[in-house]
């Protein structure tokens, strides 16, 4: 009789537990509130504005995407590929249908996606609800620099679904592999991060094939492995399903063009070396320190509570740990793939702690009460200010943005004094998406879509940096792009240079920004 751990299929369920807690203790309720508090974030993501603008235009044009960039005057001939076109349309639909509460609807949508990704990621974990919720809370706390209205979270949700499917493939469910087809078909239209999903699938499949090959040569090793090992038949079915799913990703408005755009962007060394999100992990930032603290904590828990041999999981963790250290933007992916491990290690730590404590203090009710008190204290210390900001961002965004670095006051002045400015704007990189949201009639200089764009010798991001970051600023860039008005951070290097230039006059200034207009010769 075979003793291979892959033979007996397990029931098709969402992990070992239900998708929601069967009972809601005070500790569970407080943990859920803490998670909700973290997942709800105001609309301060720089790229959100252009995603919303693209979605609103998509609705207005009956789902037709523009062939070239319609939003900038600098790169209007660029063949724009919007890899999140369906997400843009969904955001715009929520925003428009809810009227004055549209921004709040978008906030709730991203909170649901964030929490959903985390809950589903922990579903395969061998852990109870308390450990899973604590793990989710810890991961969201570490991920705070990334939280908000970021379309990348659709990819994190896709990864969670993919890992859930893989869990059931491992435990013997052959037909579930065909759900990869609708998953990747939808994913490829929601966000360009579907390529990360294909890569994850390749890592899992490659590691499983390697493990199965080793087991075939040394059958005795099968009993040493602590994760289910798919047999050759299931691996063959999975390979076929993966190929069909990969082919389905061509069913987008762009076909092969989507892959071409992604490959060209990821091959752009200047962009990768310049943008913060593509740079290496650094302890100089709060986010980097939080992440390293998470890794250290995970390592300590593993030393004392992890004794399993799981080569496929190891391969996934090692690969994405390396990617997260190499590129800052990959940290959320590692947080998602490590969530089940985090929950399992916390569960093991709680069991171990209960075993070594004196009998007089082992009462689970007392420990839950103490833990609930700690979570309540954390919620109390955070106060209501955060949720108040979220609500204001969702219901009164113009008022909310007065408290941020975004130039809402200047936008309102421009609307009231449009005749005092020009027709070709220079704006800062971080303001481009915001301006497309709040000044939809204006064409911008640059935004978050454009770091890799180049037409001939015209390299917009490089030209932008020469003007905005170089000392002294390369004012000739303004002439090259025929810019006749500038919206720039007050007292910045560029603002000081324009103050000294006779051909430019300041027409507006507030505590955040200044507006300059080119003077006639």
Stretch-by-stretch model annotation:
Residues 74-101:
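Short hydrophobic/aromatic helix or loop-helix immediately within or flanking a transmembrane segment
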Residues 108-125:
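Transmembrane-helix motifs of polytopic, lipid-linked glycan transferases
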Residues 357-416, 430-432, 450, 465-470:
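Membrane-proximal, lumen/periplasm-facing interface regions of secretory-pathway glyco-
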Residues 415-455, 483-490, 516:
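Short periplasmic/luminal acceptor-recognition loop of GT-C membrane glycosyltransferases, typified by
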């Amino acid at each position: 009789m075979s003793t291979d751990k892959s033979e007996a299929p397990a029931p098709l369920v969402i992990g070992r537990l239900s998708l929601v807690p069967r009972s809601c203790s005070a500790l569970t309720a407080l943990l859920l509130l803490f998670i909700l508090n973290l997942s709800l974030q105001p609309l301060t993501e720089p790229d959100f504005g252009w995603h919303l603008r693209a979605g609103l235009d998509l609705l207005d044009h009956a789902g037709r995407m523009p062939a070239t960039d319609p939003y900038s005057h600098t790169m209007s001939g660029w063949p724009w590929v919007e890899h999140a076109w369906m997400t843009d349309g969904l955001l715009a639909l929520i925003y428009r249908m809810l009227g004055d509460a549209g921004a709040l609807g978008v906030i709730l949508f991203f909170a649901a996606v964030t929490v959903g990704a985390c809950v589903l990621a922990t579903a395969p974990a061998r852990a109870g609800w308390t450990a899973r919720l604590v793990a989710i809370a810890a991961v969201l706390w570490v991920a705070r620099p990334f939280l908000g209205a970021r379309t990348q979270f659709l990819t994190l949700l896709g990864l969670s679904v993919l890992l859930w499917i893989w869990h059931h493939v491992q435990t013997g469910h052959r037909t579930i592999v065909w759900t990869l087809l609708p998953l990747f078909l939808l994913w490829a239209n929601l966000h360009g991060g579907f390529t990360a999903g294909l890569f994850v699938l390749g890592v899992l499949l490659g590691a499983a094939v390697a493990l199965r090959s080793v087991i075939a040569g040394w059958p005795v090793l099968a009993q040493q492995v602590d994760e289910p090992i798919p047999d050759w038949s299931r691996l063959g079915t999975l390979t076929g399903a993966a190929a069909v799913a990969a082919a389905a990703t061509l069913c987008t408005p762009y076909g092969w063009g989507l892959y071409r755009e992604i490959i060209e962007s990821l091959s752009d060394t200047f962009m990768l070396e310049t943008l913060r999100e593509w740079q290496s992990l650094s302890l100089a930032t709060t986010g980097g320190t939080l992440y390293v603290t998470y890794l250290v904590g995970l390592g300590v828990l593993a030393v004392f509570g992890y004794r399993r041999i799981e080569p496929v999981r190891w391969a996934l963790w090692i690969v994405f740990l390396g990617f997260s250290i190499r590129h800052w933007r990959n940290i959320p992916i590692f947080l998602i793939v490590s969530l089940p491990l985090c929950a399992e290690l916390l569960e093991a730590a709680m069991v171990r702690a209960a075993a070594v404590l004196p009998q007089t203090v082992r009462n689970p009710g007392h420990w839950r009460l103490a833990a609930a008190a700690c979570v309540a204290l954390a919620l109390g210390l955070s106060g209501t200010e955060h949720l108040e900001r979220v609500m204001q961002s969702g219901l009164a965004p113009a008022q909310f943005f007065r408290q941020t670095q975004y130039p809402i006051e200047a936008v309102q002045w421009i609307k009231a004094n449009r005749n005092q400015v020009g027709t070709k704007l220079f704006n800062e990189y971080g303001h481009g998406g915001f301006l497309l949201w709040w000044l939809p009639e204006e064409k911008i200089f640059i935004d978050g879509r454009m770091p890799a764009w180049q037409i001939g010798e015209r390299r917009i991001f490089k030209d932008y940096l020469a003007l905005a970051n170089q000392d002294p600023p390369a004012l000739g860039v303004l002439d090259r792009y025929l810019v006749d008005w500038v919206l720039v951070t007050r007292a910045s290097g560029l603002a000081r240079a324009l103050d000294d230039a006779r051909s430019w006059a300041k027409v507006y200034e507030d505590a955040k920004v200044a507006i300059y207009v080119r003077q006639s010769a």
